[in-house]
Amino acid sequence: DRVRVRLYTACQGSRIVEPTLCLVNDEPGDRAVPDKFNRTGFTTCEMKNFAWTDWLWDIPELSRANVQEIEFRFRISGKEVSDGDTVNFYIAEIAVERTEEPEKETGWAPRPGRLHYAQAGYRPGDPKLALVAPEDLPEDGAFTLTDENGNVVYTGEAKSMTWKENGFATLDFSDFTAQGRYRLQVGLLTSKPFPIAEDANHETVWQILNFIYCERCGCPVPGKHGLCHMDIYARHNGLLLPFGGGWHDAGDMSQQAAQTAETTQVLLQAALSFSNDTMLSERLWEEALWGLEFTLRTRFGDGVRASSLGLIRWTDNKIGSADDADNVRTQGQAMINLIDSQTEAMAALALPGRDDGLAWKCGQVAEEDFAFAMERWEKYGVELPSKWEHTYNASRCLHYAEIVRAAALLYQLTKKEGYAKTATEYADKLMACQQDEPSPCGVVGFFYRDESHKRLIHYNHQAREHLPVLALTELIKALPGNPACVEWKRSVKLFGEYIRSLAAYASPYGMLPAGVYQENEIEDRETFALEHLQSDYETEKPNYLAELRNGDDLGNGWWLRQFPVWFSFRGNSAIQLTLAAGAALTSQTLKEKDLKALAVRQAQWFGGCNPFAASLIYGAGQDSSEPYAIFPGKTVGAVAVGIQTKGNSDEPNWPNSVCATYKEVWMTAAADLLQVLSLIE
């Protein structure tokens, strides 16, 4: 169940060296390696250059029957500024080994001999829970907190329970609020020291900022890369627009203007949320302004923008040479301009006193871009961008939400009644997409793709679960005295009820389930294509139903899934974290503390209170597994696409393999976690 390779790397000048190791077998169906989506049978590892590396690949759940090949691959992807002309690898040994205790990859059960807790710590008023396997409890079930001097400061009794045929023991010390550094002890298990402090989340924010900085495009990043991608550009009306800037998308070199704009929004909000920590707030401001510059620069000024590029190579930064990328996508659709107008309006509201000139400019272009968006929307409605755009799955409901939020922000900025009118008009349309009375399964508060209520909104990779509530909370803030504010708050409250309905089915770790589904949704072939890229409808139709039936039966053809229904693209970070953001926003608006507590528990899941007892933030806490990061390399603060499921199951799966999509670092996931930490601050 382990492959071990001894490898020497000699790559001239290379700062990041990540070869790939592959297994290929001759097995049918689900036992085939690689699988049909090329998501299994691969792993990468960042090597130290000009040194020997013992490369270990644990594969306890990978089919090892009829293995035909072991492959070594290395992507030649252009030359970064420090790269030389040659790469060499020397293989000294290839071995297959058996481990005494294979690493856990699948399932809800706690890992025996491990404490599952929030390794970054807890804030005094937040829920404070940890879990262990029942066999790790002492006979009396007692657990303790000890301070830095070894003194016992708290004693509690664990509560045992069974969930989905798995045993758990929960250690709850939420009522302990004294600030300090502590260790949790139960039976023979002792945690690493962790803080209970008001600023317990700040270190995680610093770590995420480190990752975001290392994803910068068009900027030298020490130890990572030099100035990059100065020869990639968009063409429009005889103009060339350089597209180097903002942040790279993930483990590759792709760039998404919408993602950079949304990340900038999160950074702007975080800079305000963490204003009591001056150094942290200023660093957030610095990174936000980097993203804002790119958002402003992608405008051609006529409603068309440079929007995205898929790129998996370095370029030589010389315009006119053979490696130029002149195929940056351009578009003038409503969605991209709505997102960017929000970013610009947020900056215009936040910048006065810091940069008055830039504040004025942001306000000017925010109004222009909103006008472009509405003109396009009124003419064409929902338009499909390239399938590789992060907004490809955007529904009519999501467009309504973006319009409401943009108009609400612009009203706050300008006090022009036209924006208030647009925001209130589209708020009615947005609320018409919500399930506002008990559905056949008894659940309320979720949103459909449009007013017809035929198809629920679902995500399985990129996600914006929180956006309807974000729009309504912004509108409530902008127009608190409007008579319709009662209805807006009711809609937000209904979404809170939806979150509570999901939480009622949550595991002891507290992960919010992905959502509710109807069996007959699979008959909508057109929407299937929007939601499930690189997935064949006829092939996956029976798998859709199989996935539902591994969830919880709510009756009348309705099901609840812990994880999304998905096929090729799998990873739960964005779904879970945008649900958490929705819970936190609802809590802020309605002062409902239980919803904030649910949001807090999602952040704690990423900090180690999950079935793998592992931090899902690279370099933070214990057992944070190496991410898939071919170009940026291992970077503290990286958050991956997320925990997946195996086949049609509804159990968490976190393989030891380092490959896409689930293990790939992703700006979306990092920004979503930062957003949650900002909202619960």
Describe every region a protein language model picked out.
Residues D1-S63, D85-V87:
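Extracellular ligand-binding interfaces
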Residues L62-F72:
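Noncatalytic modules at the cell exterior or secretory-pathway interfaces
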Residues D1-R4, P110-D136:
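Contiguous beta-strand segments within globular domains
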Residues W57, I70, F89-V96, T586:
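Extracellular beta-strand elements of beta-rich domains used
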Residues R64, G78-E97, M667:
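Extracellular carbohydrate recognition
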Residues E101-E105, P110-R111, D140, T144-N166, ...:
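Glycan-recognition and catalytic cores of secretory/periplasmic carbohydrate-active enzymes
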